[in-house]
Structures are given as structure tokens and as C-alpha cells.
UniProtKB/Swiss-Prot annotation:
SMART domains: EFP, Elong-fact-P_C
The protein's name in its UniProt record: Elongation factor P
CDD domains per record: S1_EF-P_repeat_1 (cd04470), S1_EF-P_repeat_2 (cd05794)
Gene Ontology molecular function, alphabetical: translation elongation factor activity
Organism: Rhodospirillum rubrum (strain ATCC 11170 / ATH 1.1.1 / DSM 467 / LMG 4362 / NCIMB 8255 / S1)
GO biological process: peptide biosynthetic process
Function, as annotated: Involved in peptide bond synthesis. Stimulates efficient translation and peptide-bond synthesis on native or reconstituted 70S ribosomes in vitro. Probably functions indirectly by altering the affinity of the ribosome for aminoacyl-tRNA, thus increasing their reactivity as acceptors for peptidyl transferase.
Domain of life, source organism: Bacteria
Length: 187
């Protein structure tokens, strides 16, 4: 299925140069001069090799048709991350490198969809947002309120995110799983 490059999301499976690739990370780059483009970090489904590609936002790419399975994340162990198919109750593991940075967002009992090609799992699609707790936040420096200023915050999963100055350690926030950015304070 053809789609525009600006619709690429982590976890999707693309066909590029005759190979199947899982999207690990995306970044929209808007240079001062010229059109915007998408930088995509991908992993080859078969060999595990990684590559980086750049596409203009209007370019079209081929997204592979995959079978999506509704699953529940169970736990992490030496073999990788273990999921359970919600229909058949079968359990299977995926290696940490297959998930990339998405692994940091997994929480026990989280509902996810797993993409399978020819019966083998290749990627995980997370919810677009997760609620995480801020465990460490820098203090606000007085006088920095003239413009919107953000400060670095450390989340319970070990990831860092830029948060507004009113967020303190212990606060639960909503974080985007697409680009690891602060959305709002959790209600």
C-alpha cells in the first residue's frame, strides 16, 4: 500500500530497495531553506542490519500489508520481551533490538498490536500516548519566564523528555510514543 513519507510511524513495516524494513525512529527535519524531509532509521526484518534514509515529505513509500494481532505485553526476561496473543493465549518473545526505543514505553499488561509477516512477529505498534511518572526534574531558574522554557525531566522508564517548568518530580504526565515528547499532565 502506497503512502506519503510524512505518514511513516515507528513500528510500521516498509518495502524499500527490495527488502522489508521495520521503522525504528523518525525525525521531521525542516531546514531554513528548502522543503522539509523525513529522516527514518530502519532495521532489515531478515538480516537485522540498520540503515538511515531520508525522504521528502511528499515522496511515496510502500507500506507492506501485515497481519495485526491484538496482544498484551507480559514481561521482559533474558530472551526478550514476552507478549500474549489475546485470541489464542499463545505467548511469544521479541528481541530487544526488534523493538528499538519503543521498548522503553512498554508497561506490564499494556494492550498493543503486533505486526506479523508470514507468521513471525516483526514489529509492535504501541498506543499513541502513555502515562509515565517524572522521577527527576531540574529546578526552575528564576527569570526564565519571558518565553516558553522547558527543562529536562527523567521518566520512570529511564527516558528523558523536555517538560514545562511547573512539572516536578513525582508528577504523572502523558508522553507521546511517536517522538517521546510531553503532551500534558495526567488527569
Amino acid at each position: 500500500m502506497k503512502m506519503q513519507a510524512n505518514q511513516i510511524r515507528p513500528g510500521q513495516v516498509l518495502e524499500h530497495q527490495g527488502k522489508r524494513w521495520t521503522v525504528l525512529k523518525i525525525q521531521l527535519i525542516q531546514p531554513g531553506k528548502g522543503g522539509a524531509f523525513i529522516a527514518v532509521e530502519m532495521r532489515d526484518v531478515d538480516s537485522g542490519n540498520k540503515t538511515n534514509e531520508r525522504w521528502r515529505t511528499a515522496d511515496t513509500v510502500e507500506r507492506l500489508e501485515v497481519r495485526e494481532i491484538d496482544c498484551q505485553y507480559l514481561f521482559k526476561d533474558d530472551t526478550g520481551y514476552t507478549f500474549m496473543d489475546k485470541e489464542t493465549f499463545e505467548q511469544f518473545s521479541m528481541a530487544a533490538d526488534a523493538l528499538g526505543e519503543q521498548a522503553g514505553f512498554l508497561q506490564e499488561s499494556m494492550e498493543v498490536t503486533v505486526d506479523c509477516i508470514e507468521g513471525s512477529p516483526v514489529s509492535v505498534n504501541l498506543p499513541s500516548q502513555v502515562i509515565l511518572q517524572v522521577v527527576e526534574a531540574d529546578a526552575v531558574v528564576k527569570g526564565q519566564t519571558a518565553s516558553s522554557s522547558y527543562k529536562p525531566g527523567l521518566l520512570e522508564n529511564g527516558m528523558k523528555v523536555m517538560i514545562p517548568p511547573f512539572i516536578e518530580a513525582g508528577t504523572r504526565i502523558v508522553v507521546s510514543t511517536v517522538d517521546c515528547s510531553y503532551i500534558e499532565r495526567a488527569k
